[in-house]
Structure formats: structure tokens, C-alpha cells
């Protein structure tokens, strides 16, 4: 019974109308703000969720459980001012199928949380230019969004890909506000609210990271 339920990939909990080639669940636009930001790994112990937002700019293993057991965390996340959609990794050296699956999981959880009253802020992620075919599917236009710059300036190619994706995000989504986790590159445009990064993503790349 347990194994059978796991094989549903959460489709037994909710089915959402999808968009784009891969049927990505749609996230509604948000205009939420947070007085302070903490990583999901500190959310359970947070004593004042009403003045905090939760981000997922962490190593994936620290939050994979929100996908494995989504109902366990809904009530907790609903207490926070805002919750970013989970930043499942889209490394350029990941197989394309894995990248698309991670984008899908991010959106399924965002739509599921919104359905249950969580104040969701879309996290925008991309890898290389080929990912532009699907990585903005399901994202709202004119919304507050969250982006992480952590690890994107480690070399020229990573910096180039981050800029290409950022500018494509501006063109397609026209975000109202951009919550930028990490250093803000001097070329970045838009209504940016910087958030200092206390956790960094550490990973030994197979080829290159974004």
C-alpha cells in the first residue's frame, strides 16, 4: 500500500491544469512581503512565523521531504508571511528530463500550497538557453518573484547564463518585484529587494553550474 501510494508522484493528492509542452502546473501571481527570511531548514523551529518568509535556496536534500510528504508541512508553512516555491536544482549537467521533472515538482508544490492557503512567492530558476523552452512555463506575469544569485558568478560561463536567464525572465514575466537571494550583480535591472545569503549551495560540478 505504501509503495503504491508513493508511485503516484502526488497525483493522488491533486491534479492541476498544466501549461506548455510538459503540462506544468500554473502558479498564481503574488504580492507578498516578508520582514525577515529564513531557510526551510529553520522553519520548524521558528517562533515568530508571522514576521518571517521561508526560502528553499538550500541543498536539495534539506527540503526533498516537502515533495515526499507534502501534507506534513502545509499547516506549518501557512503560518509564515510568505513561502517561496522550492528551488529544486536545474544544474546544466543534469539530464534534461531531470531538470524538467524538478521544474514540475516546484510548480506542483506551489499550486498545492496555494490551494491550501499558503502565501506562495514563485521562485524563478533556469539552466542554459535551451531551458528557456520550458523553465518559465507556469510562472505568473506581473508578480513578486524570488531568484538566487548564489553560485552564479563562479566563472564567466555561469555568469553569462545567469544574465541570459535573468534578462529572459524580465522580458517574459515582467515581475513587479524581485527578491534577490545573494549578491546583486551590478547589471541587474528591475525592482530588486536584496536578501543576504547565509547559506550557500555547495556542489562539486560534473561540468559547470548555474
Regions picked out by a protein language model, each given a short descriptive name:
Residues 1-92, 108:
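SEC14/CRAL-TRIO lipid-binding/transfer domains and related phosphoinositide-recognition modules
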Residues 41-48, 66-207:
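Eukaryote-skewed repeat-based solenoidal scaffolds used as protein-protein interaction platforms
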Residues 210:
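Internal alpha/beta domain cores that form substrate/cofactor-binding pockets in large enzymes
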Amino acid at each position: 500500500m505504501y509503495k503504491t501510494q508513493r508511485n503516484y508522484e502526488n497525483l493522488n493528492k491533486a491534479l492541476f491544469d498544466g501549461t506548455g509542452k510538459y503540462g506544468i502546473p500554473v502558479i498564481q501571481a503574488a504580492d507578498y512581503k516578508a520582514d525577515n527570511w529564513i531557510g526551510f531548514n529553520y522553519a520548524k523551529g521558528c517562533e515568530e512565523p508571522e514576521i518571517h518568509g521561508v526560502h528553499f535556496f538550500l541543498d536539495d536534500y534539506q527540503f526533498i521531504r516537502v515533495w515526499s510528504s507534502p501534507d506534513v508541512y502545509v499547516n506549518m508553512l501557512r503560518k509564515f508571511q510568505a513561502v517561496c516555491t522550492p528551488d529544486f536544482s536545474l544544474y546544466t549537467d543534469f539530464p534534461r528530463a531531470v531538470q524538467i521533472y524538478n521544474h514540475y515538482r516546484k510548480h506542483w508544490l506551489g499550486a498545492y500550497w496555494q490551494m491550501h492557503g499558503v502565501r506562495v512567492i514563485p521562485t524563478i530558476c533556469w539552466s542554459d538557453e535551451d531551458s528557456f523552452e520550458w523553465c518559465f512555463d507556469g510562472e505568473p506575469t506581473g508578480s513578486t518573484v524570488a531568484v538566487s544569485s548564489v553560485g552564479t558568478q563562479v566563472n564567466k560561463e555561469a555568469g553569462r547564463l545567469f544574465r541570459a536567464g535573468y534578462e529572459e525572465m524580465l522580458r517574459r514575466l515582467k515581475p513587479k518585484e524581485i527578491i534577490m537571494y545573494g549578491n546583486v550583480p551590478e547589471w541587474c535591472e528591475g525592482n530588486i529587494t536584496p536578501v543576504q545569503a547565509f547559506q550557500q549551495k555547495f556542489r562539486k560540478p560534473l561540468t559547470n553550474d548555474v
